[in-house]
Amino acid sequence: TWVNITAKFYDKRGRLRKDRPKGAVLPYDRWVTRVLPSAHDVDTCYVTYSGYRTHNEDTSYIFVTHDGGKTWQDISQGMMNPVRDIEEDPDNPDILYLGTDYGIFVTFDQGKKWVKMSESAPDVIVMDMAIQKRERDLAIATYGRGFFIADIQPFKEFKKAVFEKEAYLFEPQRIVKWNMMERRGETYGEFAYTPNPPVGGYLYYWLKDKAEKVKLLIKDLEGNVIQELTGGKAKGLQKVFWNLRKKPKEQGGMAGRFRRRMGPMVEAGVYKVTLVVNGQEVMTQKLKVESDPILLDKD
């Protein structure tokens, strides 16, 4: 059976009821753009509206209920931006992603404050969004500007306790050691493709204040340092790319001035990542490197 929730607020003539529920009033003459039941709480649901089609307005309409639809809260915070889509983080219930007519916004506190998510994505209409839970990727489809993917790996650990620390190393996402193969005998017209991303993965960390020196040490399980990466020193969220290679070894001749540009790639397995800030080891996390699943299937 279906229940008309909007009828709790308006009579048949569209006038507000005097006995309407407390809290925010859901609009009855705006376009419903998304209904999103929470994956974390059975009584929580998000609803977004847009008045652009019916009233040519830019007002944001974002509502949430925590009691199964009995009462609602307005979490739009006065934004003037037609809303198209809303997604809930699969691992962190405090995080919501908002697709609007002017780009992507995110909240880390269930709608108390919304911020622009990325400067790299264009400020155009976001038609649809989807989260790939395993890879922690946010896929975004826009109107006229293409398809984008955002890495939201560290967001699942975004908590007040993390931001109060001087430095924090987020749990690394598994990295697949892809086998790069070159296709031959095909022209562009026969096989259209886009360049593959580089083999490796990003490591994320947080700095409460600007640091003098930041390094990330990659170690094997015996504690041997196999790679040393230099990180950004600015405060806030930082990321460093590791190409799955060990430190290059020196080569002989010319007093050792000629060195290998890249060391060998690591084998699949478990490694340790240590965040070093201003010479002090702050935190260590484990990192899993997996083999290309295609190669595993062949075995």
What do the predicted segments below correspond to?
Residues V225-P264:
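Glycine-centered tight-turn motifs at strand-turn-strand junctions
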Residues K113-V115, E222-L229, V282:
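Surface-exposed loop/edge segments in extracytoplasmic proteins
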